[in-house]
UniProtKB/Swiss-Prot annotation:
UniProt source species: Shewanella halifaxensis (strain HAW-EB4)
NCBIfam families: dapE_proteo (TIGR01246), PRK13009.1 (NF009557)
Obligatory cofactor(s): Zn(2+); Co(2+)
Biological processes annotated in GO: diaminopimelate biosynthetic process; L-arginine biosynthetic process; lysine biosynthetic process via diaminopimelate
Protein name per the record: Succinyl-diaminopimelate desuccinylase
Lineage: Bacteria, Pseudomonadati, Pseudomonadota, Gammaproteobacteria, Alteromonadales
Pathway this chain belongs to: Amino-acid biosynthesis; L-lysine biosynthesis via DAP pathway; LL-2,6-diaminopimelate from (S)-tetrahydrodipicolinate (succinylase route): step 3/3
Amino acid sequence: MSQNTDSPVLSLAKDLISRQSVTPLDEGCQQLMADRLADAGFNIESMVFEDTTNMWARRGTQSPVFCFAGHTDVVPVGDLNRWHTPPFEPVVIDDYLHGRGAADMKGSLAAMLVATERFIKKFPDHQGSIAFLITSDEEGPFINGTTRVIDTLEARNEKITWSLVGEPSSTHKLGDIVKNGRRGSLTGNLTVKGVQGHVAYPHLADNPIHKAAPALDELARMKWDNGNEFFPPTSFQIANINGGTGASNVIPGALEVMFNFRYSTEVTAEILIERVLNILDAHGLEYDIDWVFNGLPFLTGDGPLLEATKAAIKKVTGTNTDPQTSGGTSDGRFIAPTGAQVIELGPVNATIHKVNECVKVSDLELLTDCYEAILENLLCK
């Protein structure tokens, strides 16, 4: 029998990737992690809400509480024929670990766990507490995942001091970028009402597309704010428009428009909603609109977590990391409102959600070292 020569982090990453945990499935990933965390002295709580599996694991009862946050679910693989290797059969080719979830984010989960095991072995009497908040519903509707766990913790007044989310934050090399905040996200589902009719008799109909076009143009041209030193200006984007029956001789009776704001801390969701409604009303539209609040903006400024992260990355990689707030949303948006400082640090994100997703094996080793150094910087003072 050949001996497994994989490093601890590579071996665990392979084990996690081999489990087909497409949202909201977990497929035993959390149990695998829980068994090892229990051996390291963690108290394990499984929190299952509807179709979602969550894990809250904690070692220690004192503050401050350092929490690794992440997800075991992955996005669907897409066209299997375009994968060079089977997506759930992890393999290393030229120092790259291939498989769905390698970068987003089973590689990070493996690095978190191995770093924690090493840290506890060195410092069994560390300060404060270490926790893991892991969900199988980050890539999906995010209804029964991290947000429900946070609600549970808040209800019993269990507070997180610092949270490191393992999202793939790096762009060109490991640690070149960390996310110390995220923009808010607000979605509007607008239905503009008209009167269906024959295109040859427009006076007997009311075309909602024609009515809505000037308002949509104004919304698209609007400057919502100027941003600030931490956030770019708020962005309004139309994501989907649907109107008509598919026939060239029918004026539609309604127009459906889906749009999204990614907004800075210079505005609130309430301000954006008010301004949108004012524009729609000014154009005399008859409409219905539903709003979906996807997350508030948050920012972790200079403080213990950001400083510990910067120092760890510099020590391990030699890189002076660049804190940014760009990109999409993450589960950090559910943790930050509790008052916790939140940072995202993970592998290079070049292949996430793509076919042939992969991560450098050497980056997983460096990421493990970074996570361990962050623990030392915060809990060994």
